[in-house]
């Protein structure tokens, strides 16, 4: 006898909410998003307080600096979340947009039109910001969402979900369009992945372990990426002052996020001019550099010789691997071999 999935009630109400969303006008969804943003802004003090309790437990648990940074919500970050939802509200509504159209030789006219998926399962780890991001983007695109955040951010997510659902009750959108699974049980991930009668797609956001578990358990399509081995390539034709500022931002602003730079590639023709600038900036920022033989002369004795595994490592920390390459083709070959195809950049003035 097949066991009943305990999350079926959540799936059923989310499905009903997704059908109601189909009937809403773009302005009704935009208003709901603005109400959600206002609610988050008004509840900032409570959200930060609940997040502080999560932070305290994470510190006691010995979590590293990158993890704590992902978990942390400051008043400024809460305001950033609210503004983000307002920005999503202001975007053109994607539902009903014609992507392309064509006429067949037999006269049949075909249009490819954007439509909502239905119900999205969003599984993530320690970032409370994802609660608002996922809810806003799903609502804007006409989808209901069932959120399952990490147990480390349980209080934070509860506070955020409470605010978002309260805001929806003041709008034309059903509060069941945004639901949070908050038991903290590890079984919830497997159970959510098994809601194939209600979910249309699952989006996991987190580390390799989470992504692999979701991929293994899921009975619906999964939108995923595994790693964030991201590169900055500085070409010989780059504006070097701009390049060092881009590198600084890409590596040091949020080193624990998945789109932070992990490897710097420098054209050999620019190495003598650029690497001293990069070495000094990274030294000032407290970044540990792991360097290839060709780049080592430009770094001090504190630089560490790079090992083979460094080129494919997502550090999630103030660590940067550095390699000199022979032009853009060599750089692209390196990125294709070692990278994760997440977020890579080429800095050049030569189009």
Region locations from a protein language model:
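Rossmann-like NAD(P) dinucleotide-binding subdomain of oxidoreductase/dehydrogenase enzymes
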Residues: 90, 98-237, 241
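ALDH superfamily catalytic-core signature
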Residues: 5, 126-144, 159, 163, ...
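Conserved C-terminal structural/oligomerization subdomain of aldehyde/semialdehyde dehydrogenase
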Residues: 117, 307-351
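A structural signal for short, well-ordered beta-strand elements
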Residues: 22-23, 236, 324, 347
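N-terminal Rossmann-like NAD(P)+-binding subdomain of aldehyde/semialdehyde dehydrogenases
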Residues: 1-110
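Flexible, glycine/charged-enriched surface loops at secondary-structure junctions
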Residues: 24-30, 95, 171-178, 254-260, ...
């Amino acid at each position: 006898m097949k066991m009943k999935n305990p999350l079926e009630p959540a799936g059923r109400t989310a499905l009903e909410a997704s059908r109601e969303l189909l009937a809403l006008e773009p302005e009704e969804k935009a208003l709901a998003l603005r109400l959600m943003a206002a609610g988050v802004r008004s509840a900032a003090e409570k959200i930060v307080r609940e997040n502080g309790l999560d932070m305290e437990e994470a510190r006691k648990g010995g979590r590293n600096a990158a993890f704590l940074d992902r978990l942390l919500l400051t008043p400024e970050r809460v305001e950033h979340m609210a503004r983000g939802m307002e920005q999503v509200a202001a975007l053109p509504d994607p539902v009903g947009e014609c992507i392309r159209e064509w006429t067949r030789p037999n006269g049949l006219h075909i249009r490819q039109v954007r439509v909502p998926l239905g119900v999205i399962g969003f599984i993530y780890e320690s970032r409370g910001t994802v609660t608002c991001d996922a809810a806003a983007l799903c609502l804007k695109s006409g989808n209901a969402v069932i959120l399952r955040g990490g147990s480390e951010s349980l209080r934070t997510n509860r506070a955020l979900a409470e605010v978002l659902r309260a805001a929806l009750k003041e709008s034309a959108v059903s509060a069941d369009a945004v639901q949070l699974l908050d038991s903290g049980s590890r079984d919830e991930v497997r159970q959510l992945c098994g809601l194939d009668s209600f979910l249309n797609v699952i989006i996991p956001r987190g580390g390799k372990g989470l992504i692999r578990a979701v991929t293994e358990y899921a009975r619906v399509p999964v939108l995923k990426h595994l790693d964030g081995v991201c590169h900055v390539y500085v070409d010989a034709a780059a504006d070097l002052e701009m390049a060092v500022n881009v590198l600084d931002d890409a590596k040091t602003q949020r080193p624990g996020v998945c789109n932070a730079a992990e490897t710097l590639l420098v054209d050999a023709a620019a190495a003598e001019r650029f690497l001293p600038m990069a070495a000094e900036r990274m030294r000032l920022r407290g970044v540990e550099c792991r360097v290839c033989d060709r780049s080592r002369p430009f770094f001090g004795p504190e630089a560490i010789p790079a090992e083979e595994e460094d080129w494919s490592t997502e550090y999630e920390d103030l660590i940067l691997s550095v390699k000199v390459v022979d032009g853009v083709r060599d750089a692209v070959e390196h990125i294709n071999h070692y990278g994760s195809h997440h977020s890579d950049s080429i800095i050049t003035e030569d189009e």
